[in-house]
Amino acid sequence: MKIVRNVWLAIVAIVMMGCVDKKPFFEMRGAVLAVEDLETADWPRIAYENGINTLGTHITPNQVLRFWESEKGKQFQEECRRYGIKVEHELHAMKDLLPRELFDMDSTMFRMDESGRRVADFNCCVSSARALDTIAAQALFYAQHLTSTNHRYYFWLDDGAPICQCPECSTLSASEQALIIENRMLTAIRTYDKEAMVAHLAYYSSLKAPEKVKPEEGIFLEFAPFQRRLDKPINDSISEVSDIGNNAVNLTYLKENLKVFPVETAVVLDYWLDVSMASRWKKPAVELPWNGDVFRSDVDTYAAMGIRNVTTFAVYMDSTYFATYPRTDYLKEYGAAINR
């Protein structure tokens, strides 16, 4: 009997060890916040208490750098270290990477519009070696000053904005022009961080997978289905969505991109907690219209496609938001689903 009992205890111990060692399916379980959110709400603690293991800062490199070097920014970094939260920076970057005032020095670094004029409104000319060198040098500067504790770097082009139409660039899609820049930034940043990975943002005009340009090893897919309904699952093919047709069209784009970029490192950046979107990017913020069933369906869909990294905008969730809308059960639901 004693032998049987010892065997039984050993089996129980093995089972318990398996339970303890079992890791969640999703490796990155994130949220992306604007500087004002991070300055006024205790997001390292909120993340820790709700099973979020990665926080992304937002919006522009210069803005985030000012926060990062401030006392509040240093406190944020220390709290993230204390709670074991990884930090990355998801940045609308082009105007900081290629400052618009350089236009007078060399207009060929900037995009050509449909009428053949060089303009400094958005993005750049990816056929300009000088533009790519400038962008790469600036990306390296920000990578050195904005520590990414998971070695992922996000420097986005201008949101859904016009791209270069010069003779050399006009044959390239938005995603291909973006990938040229991303490949160049990766080379520069790896002189500082040998483990660096750079995001290729598939979003809005760059949803189409690149064909003519190939990603260097270390470029990872970041897929952001901006054109979607959040009251319907991402695999819904019935309810109409303007410009794209329906939610499920996003998954077609995702599948095509996963033929180009590794699924193992791919990230989905969705909008489940995005108060700024619900508020139409204008304060005062409205209360988050949380759809828990939709969210859980979405993460199941992404998991079935092999996606192991998910995050969401949670912009406008600052101290004023939490004081105005104290109910936060959706954070527990979010954390529970991505920690399965």
Language model features with spans:
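Bacterial Sec-dependent signal peptides at the C-terminal "C-region" and cleavage site
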Residues: 15-25
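Sec-dependent N-terminal signal peptides
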Residues: 6-16
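Second-shell residues forming the walls of enzyme active-site clefts
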Residues: 245-255
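Aromatic-lined carbohydrate-binding surfaces of glycoside hydrolases
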Residues: 30-243, 258-261, 265-302, 307-340
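N-terminal secretory signal peptides that target proteins for export/translocation
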Residues: 1-3
